Each structure stands twice: as C-alpha cells, then as structure tokens.
Amino acid sequence: SQSVGQITAGIASELDQQNYLILLGNTELDEQRELGYLTAMQRNHVAGIILLGCYYSPQLARAFKACRVPLVVTGQRFPEVPCVYNDDRSAARELAQRMLACGHRRLAYIGGTEKDQAVGLARRQGVQDALNAAGLDGDKLPRLCCSAFTMEEGERCMNELLACCPDLDGVVCVTDTVALGAMRALRAAGRAIGTQVSLAGI
C-alpha cells in the first residue's frame, strides 16, 4: 500500500543517515515466512529488525520476545514487544462520530480481515463504539470485508452493500483506496456523495 511505501522510505532514509544498509524481506503476511526471516536475520547478525504489517499470533509474539537483536513491530500491538502503531479504534470512532453529527444514522462499514487486529478488528469496533454512544445498535452495523485494500474491492463491497442496504446514508472504509472504489460504485448508482451518502476512508 501507499502507506507501507512511505514508511519504508522513511526507515531507509534514516538508516542511510546512520550508515546502515537496509535488507528487505517480503513475507506476504505468511507467518512461517515471517518466522523464517526472523531466524535468518538473527543468524546473520543484523543490527535490528523492523516488522511492518504482520498479524498478531501467540507464536509470533513468543518469537519476537525471544529475539536476540533489537526488534520493533509497526502497525500492530504485541504485548511486551516494542511497537509503533496507530490508535485505529479511536480514529474510526471519531470518523463515524463526524458522520453521525451530520445527521447520518444508517452507517455501513467496508473493512478488512479481522485476523489483522489493528486495521481489521479495531477500526470496525471504533465505528460500532460511535453508533452505540449515539444510542444506535453497533452490533447491527452492516459490514463487508475486502480481500485486498484496492479500488476494485471497494467498488465490489459498495455494490453489495447497496444491494442489501439501499437506504444507507454513510459509509466508513478501512482505507482511502477502498473508499475511492466505493465512491465509484456510489456514483454509478446515482447516489450523491456528501448529500445523500457520506463517505470516508481511514
């Protein structure tokens, strides 16, 4: 995603200033590959390890805690492991609260896999928190899960939501890219964005 590219560029720039070389490994969110890279990098005596975008699991948490070199996880919370992450739940809650403050009451959510506790689970919970605080039933939030954070998936999910919830008046999307796809579907359906339907990505 664009954000991962920006984070990687920032890390590379800082390491370059400190005269470190960066070694990249792409695991495609495969836990066994993540564990394999972790072992290989320790054997090769790297100065430190930064992990971007892994899913939480007890096995990974144990491996991270046992790591013999400095290690930081970004984008996900692992107990007793140094982590840098966003407050995804609060971000989603505040976004939904803004929609509710504009008078929208029939919100829907386009999210990601809830194996990802930060982006997938916490963001959905944030939207539900806002609905519950407004006296609505967050458990009844219409939601769909994207298989990837792409415009195509956003468009597909939005079309499905329009078919099952034609009276929705607000949509929170897991990312801006997904929201762009949802916008395309709303326009094709003749829905006026900003008046008939509010739309936003986190």
Which sequence ranges carry the predicted segments?
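A conditional alpha-helix N-cap/helix-loop micro-motif detector
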Residues: V4, D30-E31, G53, D88-R89, ...
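Phosphate- and divalent-cation-binding pockets in alpha/beta enzyme and binding domains
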Residues: S3-Q6, R33, Q59-L60, G126, ...
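Short beta->alpha connector loops
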Residues: E28-E31, L52-S57, T177
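Intrinsically disordered, low-complexity polar regions and short flexible loop motifs
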Residues: I49
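Short beta-strand->loop structural element characteristic of the AMP-binding/adenylate-forming
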Residues: I22-N26
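Active-site-adjacent beta->alpha loops and helix N-cap segments on the catalytic face
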Residues: Y56-C67
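N-terminal winged-helix
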Residues: S1-S13
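Bacterial carbohydrate/catabolite-sensing allosteric modules
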Residues: G10-L21, G36-H45, K65-V73, R77-I202
